[in-house]
Amino acid sequence: MKTVPFLSLLQAGILTSGIVAQNIAFVGSNANAIATVSFDTKTGTFKVTGNNTDSSTPSWQEVSRDGKLLYSIEETSTEHALTSYSIGQDGKLKKLKSIKGLAGPVSLDMHPTQPIIITANYGSASASAYSSKDNGELTHLGDFMFKMQGKGKVPDRQDAPHPHQALFDPTGKFVLMPDLGSDLIRILKVDAGQKFSVAPPNKVKPGTGPRHGVLYPASDKPRFYYVVGELSNTVTAMSVEYTVETIKLTEIQTLSTLPDGQRGAAGELILSPSGKHLYASNRLDKVFPGSSSVASYTIDQMTGKLKLLEIFNGGVENIRHMSIHPSGKWFVTEGQNSNDIKVFALDPETGKVTPEAKSTLEIEKPVCLQWWHNGAQESEAPEAGTETECEFDD
């Protein structure tokens, strides 16, 4: 009888589990559903394998750090709820718990090491914090209500604070929140014992309307921060300086996301897995008739400065969210208005996509796509031959 070393089986199991997980994604939509989709990395095609309709207008989703739970928020429902789901081995979702929140949540993020969730609530000029348990139970920790004096440079959009994203820094000591209404990058400080306080914010140019940002490098202590301006259609590069009380951001450079003479409403901003390239989605622009465009940039890793690589056809209308497969070889755009998702082949070295999409998935009003990960995927297999044995300040 042929025998196979247990270690080999263990390694195979770890690798297979990771591969399966990273080839499944969850698509939140304004059609009151979260779809589970499988992805074929050979053909670049999606297939819907599940559809959960337990939540209304699931506007943003995040997978828990251990890959066992999915958290989702409801932007326009009457409950404005934060909801937890268990993730089955096949990626199917089962609703666990739901907790009512403040109006208009549009983004959520999880603390890198603690069971804390932060939401940015665009519609109520606020941020909310929750604690979570392994069984999906959620507890409301508190809210932050933001204020501003008068109106901003774009008064019809900047009549009140509108935090549009919540982003924990890698140290877990701060939360960065682009505030579209106030032209600020607000900072929350995370203290011991799950205590939070408001830290000094950072200003951006009037009329920018900061929407989403990313830290670079994405791991360890970042040196740069990039933020996309919805109202100005720009990407701003900023240096990062950690102080005891806050994260200080200083502008390095600002570039347009559109060709001269074009107008639109910039949406999402994402980094490539390699960290070499940055992508900003445009919405309601006319660069490519009937489709939204995407601007790509190369990153100077020493200075943080950006250089426009290309502006390409995203193939869908109103790219509120976009994503890159963990392999770095596939670029995904989601069309909120065109009811579809496009997949483009992506060259990880050059950062460029193929002119034509490799595949299309029809799905109603997609607004967020998150890849599933799990602990096995993120853990390195042992080398061959080795043995394995919140509380708030007032």
From Swiss-Prot:
Pathway: Carbohydrate degradation; pentose phosphate pathway; D-ribulose 5-phosphate from D-glucose 6-phosphate (oxidative stage): step 2/3. GO terms for biological process: glucose metabolic process; pentose-phosphate shunt. One of its GO terms (cellular component) is extracellular region. Its EC number is 3.1.1.31. Keywords: Carbohydrate metabolism, Glucose metabolism, Glycoprotein, Hydrolase, Secreted, Signal. Residues 1-21 form the signal peptide. The keyword Signal applies. One of its GO terms (molecular function) is 6-phosphogluconolactonase activity. Glycans are attached at N51. The keyword Phosphoprotein does not apply. InterPro entries: Cycloisomerase_2 (IPR050282), Haem_d1_sf (IPR011048), Lactonase_7-beta_prop (IPR019405), WD40/YVTN_repeat-like_dom_sf (IPR015943). It comes from the Eukaryota. It catalyses: 6-phospho-D-glucono-1,5-lactone + H2O = 6-phospho-D-gluconate + H(+). It is found in: Secreted. Catalyzes the hydrolysis of 6-phosphogluconolactone to 6-phosphogluconate. Belongs to the cycloisomerase 2 family. This is Probable 6-phosphogluconolactonase ARB_02015.
